[in-house]
Each structure stands twice: as structure tokens, then as C-alpha cells.
Amino acid sequence: MALIDEIRQKIEAEQFEFSKHAVDQSIIRRINVQETRELFGDAEVIEDYPEDKYGPSCLILGKTREGRPLHIQCSYPSRPLIKIITLYEPDPDLWIDFRIRRTS
């Protein structure tokens, strides 16, 4: 099973939690839990961080039902609960099609 499919399966089963940082950022950036769930429907892994210092994680791009693009960094599904590390609306000045980081 693909990484995104395993993550999606855990999200749908409510097997996820937010880091304190993600909770703080969701309040500041006005991203609610429902939007977080919605974006996994057509989500894709755009960056992979297998050697992340706190454990393997990846950056996911998805869109809410309203079409709002969001990035979520989360742990691999090998954990009992997926940890949502951070989430934000990507800046189009920093991303090409919200998928590829622009270089200077």
C-alpha cells in the first residue's frame, strides 16, 4: 500500500493527533479539524523526510472541499497515531503549483 493510502486510512479511522505546534498554528491560520480531514481525499505526498530528527515524516498537499490548498507535515503511519506536526496554507510565491519549492 502506498504511503499516502496508509496515512489516509489512519486519518479516516480517527487515528491521528495534533502536536502542540500544529494546534497553535491551526488557530493562528484558521484551519479547522474538518478542513484537515477533508484534504486527505485527494492528497499527495510532495516531500518525504525519512531521516527527520523526530522520526520519519512527510509533507502532504491536499485541498479542502472549498478548494483551499493546505500543506500538512505528519509522521509516517508506522506510529499507532499519526502525528500532525504542522499545517499551513502554502504561499504561491514560495511554491510552484503548491507542489515544488521555488528556488532563488
Regions found by a protein language model. Give the residues of each.
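Ribonuclease/tRNase effector modules and their secretory precursors
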Residues: 1-104
